[in-house]
């Protein structure tokens, strides 16, 4: 790719970013758009409507300053530890690429430019130069300047590992601090017990009560048996949906003509429909709750956190297949459809998910091959000779080779996060947070494989096959293929990174949906949705740009300023979104950080493998041998971090649990907490529904037709 094509891509995306910034600064101040750009502040009642109509139409950047103001403590209080972990991931990346950027731009880039392996740089016409002239490919074989790159690789590796250690330790301590500062929660006192053995003449509830009463007599408190309620839940969801429609349906004004016309009995019709649904739901609840209809699983609660932890980690039976225990999620985080599926259905679902992921990976190679075809202008002219005249136009060729490939790849990637979330939901996870973590992990490795490896090895299928059949050649193959795609990934960072981050700020899809809904029906100011943060979509994106920056920092240092600008935009925009848009739906307690840590370690090892292959190709034998221990030390460092910090992420230490239990003895709210703990894990589909059929006619029309408890 020529420098002119990159400049064209940068120019187009810079204009889009400025346009989105201006539009956001104006549209966010319009009252009708508050539900799109400020739903969380509306829900909290912390946003005042503007009285100055003129100021609403003047672009302002005050929101940027406001997004910098909240401290980390305030962010944790409002968005939980997951929000803090996400922002720490971005600040970690900023530190890494500020350090790598200084080395890359001020040291490595000048060294690459003054090489003469390819051709002499045309200083008179910078835009006509190839981007390869700014990469390590411009250095000759056995060039002594390659030792500068060798030193840079060691420096960045040590710097990143030190940062990873301090960040892992910081998040682990924050996890303990968050546990100390939080109020007592049901999941801290509860475990999930599965594979409860059948007992003649006893129900599942009696079996659980007798077993834990005998074996955990000093700590056992209560239990809730789980039922299969998938069919019943669909009926309840329909009733709730109808209730919302009736609740927000505006009453029809009576006119003289309507007074003499046939009576409009819409309210009575809906009330009768809801009453019929209520009756069906009650019958369904009675049927599901009948003896013998239970799932052989239960949520078992204890009087203390230490008692729950002891029961969780201790084998409960001589037969290891019975009384299996695992941590209980938050009550509102439970994925209830998981319990309605049989063992065979779960087993088949896991196999189906594996095949679906493989199929999606294969299908995604189509846009990758298309993208690579667009970046090769001579190949396009050869395959489509009738386009030669159009492709000969400089502006058209720059747009096709510099902007269009990244745009196609960006659009294709939009379907991956929701698809992976759906696949994870049928895989057999007991809570929504586990579904998000599983989807996040799938999206990370899907992106790395299909966007990175499939792109760099897209020359031919036989080329990929030769890499698989001869693993020893992987570093050499990477050293050849990865630098060749440097120009594409620079354009990818500009197109996907910058523009995607700005579209996250502008919330294009919710804005369009809101505009269309207002066009067809009047909007209710009190009816809006506060969305949760979609970590499975945004975390892989940030991590992938981190992988690109680490991999290319010594190969093509020109990518580093664009990566750094992306993380600056991400820092400002995501802080703004946490303040104004997203509200936490659940909190994993920082469990996304190990995933982030392992991905960064993979990025380092990948960079080191490419460096070993590159120095081998450049005939730098001594440098190659000196680099071989580097990935070994990196993996040993990762193992040290895993042994040192991961136990805190899997279980809380005994001293932490006992300290909190002692503090609870002096807490006057604990009796009320224990009363609520008894029913905290009751299935929402089994909660009672009530219609307001009593009272006068006017009361029945003005009061809610259906009331229900929310969990």
Curated annotation (Swiss-Prot):
TM stretches of this protein: 2-22, 89-109, 146-166, 351-371, 403-423, 443-463, 488-510, 553-573, 595-615, 620-640
Cellular component aspect of the GO annotation: membrane
Keyword Iron: no
GO terms assigned for molecular function: calcium-activated cation channel activity
Swiss-Prot/TrEMBL keywords: Calcium, Ion channel, Ion transport, Membrane, Transmembrane, Transmembrane helix, Transport
Record InterPro entries: Csc1-like (IPR045122), CSC1/OSCA1-like_7TM (IPR003864), CSC1/OSCA1-like_cyt (IPR027815), Csc1/OSCA1-like_N (IPR032880)
Coiled-coil residue spans: none
Topological category with respect to the lipid bilayer: Multi-pass membrane protein
Record localization: Membrane
Main location group: membrane
Origin: domain of life: Eukaryota
Protein family: Belongs to the CSC1 (TC 1.A.17) family.
Function noted in UniProt: Acts as an osmosensitive calcium-permeable cation channel.
PANTHER family (UniProt xref): ERD (EARLY-RESPONSIVE TO DEHYDRATION STRESS) FAMILY PROTEIN, PROBABLE MEMBRANE PROTEIN DUF221-RELATED
The protein's name in its UniProt record: Hyperosmolality-gated Ca2+ permeable channel 2.4
């Amino acid at each position: 790719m020529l420098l002119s094509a990159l400049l064209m891509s940068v120019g187009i995306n810079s204009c889009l970013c400025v346009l989105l910034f201006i539009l956001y600064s104006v549209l966010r101040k319009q009252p009708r758009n508050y539900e799109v750009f400020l739903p969380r502040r509306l829900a909290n009642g912390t946003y005042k409507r503007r009285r100055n109509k003129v100021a609403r139409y003047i672009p302002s950047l005050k929101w940027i300053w406001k997004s910098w103001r909240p401290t980390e403590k305030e962010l944790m209080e409002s968005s939980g530890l997951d929000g803090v972990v996400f922002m720490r991931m971005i600040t970690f990346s900023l530190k890494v690429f500020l350090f790598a950027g200084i080395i890359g731009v001020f040291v490595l880039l000048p060294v690459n430019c003054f090489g003469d392996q390819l051709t002499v740089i045309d200083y008179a016409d910078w835009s006509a130069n190839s981007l390869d002239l700014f990469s390590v490919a411009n250095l000759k074989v056995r060039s002594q300047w390659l030792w500068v790159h060798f030193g840079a690789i060691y420096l960045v590796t040590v710097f990143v590992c030190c940062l990873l250690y301090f960040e892992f330790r910081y998040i682990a301590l924050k996890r303990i601090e968050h546990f100390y500062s939080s109020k007592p929660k049901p999941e801290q006192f509860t475990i999930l017990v599965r594979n409860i053995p059948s007992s003649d003449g006893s129900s599942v509830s009696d079996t659980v009560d007798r077993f834990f009463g005998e074996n955990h007599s000093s700590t056992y408190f209560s239990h809730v048996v789980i039922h299969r309620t998938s069919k019943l839940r669909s009926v309840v969801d329909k009733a709730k949906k109808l209730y919302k429609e009736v609740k927000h349906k505006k009453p029809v004004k009576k006119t003289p003509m309507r007074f003499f016309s046939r009576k409009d009995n819409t309210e009575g019709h809906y009330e009768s429909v809801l009453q019929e649904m209520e009756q069906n739901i009650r019958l369904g609840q009675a049927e599901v709750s009948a003896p013998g209809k239970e799932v052989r699983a239960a949520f078992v609660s204890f009087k203390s956190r230490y008692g729950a932890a002891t029961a969780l980690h201790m084998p409960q039976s001589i037969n290891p297949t019975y009384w299996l225990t695992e941590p209980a999620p938050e009550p509102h985080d439970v994925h209830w459809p998981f319990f309605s599926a049989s063992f065979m259905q779960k087993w088949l679902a896991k196999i189906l998910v594996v095949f679906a992921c493989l199929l999606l990976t294969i299908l995604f190679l189509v846009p990758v091959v298309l993208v690579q075809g667009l970046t090769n202008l001579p190949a396009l002219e050869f395959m489509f000779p009738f386009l030669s005249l159009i492709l000969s136009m400089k502006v058209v060729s720059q747009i096709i080779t510099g902007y269009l490939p990244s745009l196609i790849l960006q659009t294709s990637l939009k379907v991956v996060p929701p698809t992976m979330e759906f696949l994870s939901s049928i895989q057999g996870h007991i809570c929504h947070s586990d579904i998000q973590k599983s989807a996040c992990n799938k999206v990370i490795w899907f992106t790395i494989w299909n966007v990175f490896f499939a792109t760099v090895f897209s020359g031919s299928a036989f080329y990929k096959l030769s890499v698989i059949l001869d693993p020893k050649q992987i570093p050499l193959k990477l050293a050849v293929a990865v630098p060749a795609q440097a120009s594409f990934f620079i354009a990818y960072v500009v197109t996907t990174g910058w523009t995607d981050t700005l579209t996250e700020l502008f919330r294009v899809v919710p804005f369009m949906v809101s505009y269309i809904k207002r066009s067809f029906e009047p909007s209710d100011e009190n009816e809006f949705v506060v969305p949760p943060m979609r970590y499975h979509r945004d975390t892989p994106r940030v991590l992938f740009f981190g992988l690109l920056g680490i991999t290319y920092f010594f190969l093509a240092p020109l990518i580093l300023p664009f990566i750094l600008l992306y993380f600056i935009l991400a820092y400002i925009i995501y802080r703004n979104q946490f303040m104004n848009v997203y509200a936490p739906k659940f909190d994993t307690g920082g469990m996304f950080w190990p995933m982030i840590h392992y991905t960064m370690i993979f990025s380092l090892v990948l960079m080191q493998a490419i460096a070993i292959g590159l120095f081998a190709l450049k005939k730098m034998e001594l440098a190659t041998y000196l680099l071989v221990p580097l990935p070994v030390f990196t993996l040993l460092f990762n193992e040290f971090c895993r042994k040192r910090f991961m136990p805190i992420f899997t279980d809380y230490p005994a001293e932490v649990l006992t300290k909190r239990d002692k503090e609870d003895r002096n807490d006057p709210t604990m009796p009320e907490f224990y009363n609520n703990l008894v029913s905290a894990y009751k299935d929402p589909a089994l909660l009672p529904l009530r219609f307001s059929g009593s009272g006068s006619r006017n009361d029945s029309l003005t009061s809610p037709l259906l009331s229900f408890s929310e969990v």
